[in-house]
């Protein structure tokens, strides 16, 4: 189990590392290609758009061919598209490469996490998802560092190194044993589960909402910090601190959700996210804004582990393949991340940063009010030591 956790953790680490590497480079691409906030939002949105398009195909691949082939497709595509992104010399090639990286991400995450959860005892599911997600956040932590390095060395060499890591991980995954699907579950099972299972519906929404929050933050915060005088290294440092706190917290949060249920940490995440989203538009000092951004990352990131665990709990209860469960998570995350980046950037460009942030505050408060009336239908799992 530990070896599999390390492998899956490494896969999602590399994936999120490259996803987050764009953040400190956004001001560079804005200057080089003349992108405004809307154009920067579109570039950020290409990755989750690719994940959205590949969400269902990745689940079908895991259900039909198995988790290992799904992971290998994702890692192979990541290696190719990372090199392409590093060498891109126009807006359309950047956008296309970023879109295909999102496709690769859907396959890597769906296959990797389904592989892990299928092998996990039910009482340790939250902890293992939290540990894997902690590794993913550590990748997001290191990603801005890669982006900052790329701003000095050039994107080709920096992103070429990331592609090399993907190739190494593909070789390791190929050498690791994985069970083949015992039966082929039709796509109709996913549709039926999403339509009929209230817990899956709730978990999907609680995956989409933080994606909206992070998508908006990923565009507006770096550009605002740049306006206040900070360069790529400073922006990267802010996200480094934020992701470090998230990475340390995710496994603890997973264990807490195993012990006490999925809803208490989700309610806390909603309340804290509403507060920081309310505060984000106002700081006029870079250091103060940096502190609020760190708090925002911690609050927004507190959704992922309990929300994903809620979806996998419901999948097990309804007999849904885990590959389909994580396909649903991808389908929920992708439009949120893309919508937050593209719509948040466009709305802020047309009005001000306050409008998208305050709209998200209202969404968090409305969801919290609804969740206060929601009751879990299953008792908390007994956490295994």
Residue ranges of predicted features:
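Juxtamembrane intracellular "pre-TM" segments in multi-pass secondary transporters
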Residues: 1, 177-205
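Paired small-residue
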Residues: 81, 92-100, 287-295
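Intracellular juxtamembrane helix-capping segments at the cytosolic ends
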Residues: 108-120, 303-317
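Helix-loop-helix hairpin linking two adjacent transmembrane segments in secondary transporters
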Residues: 131-174
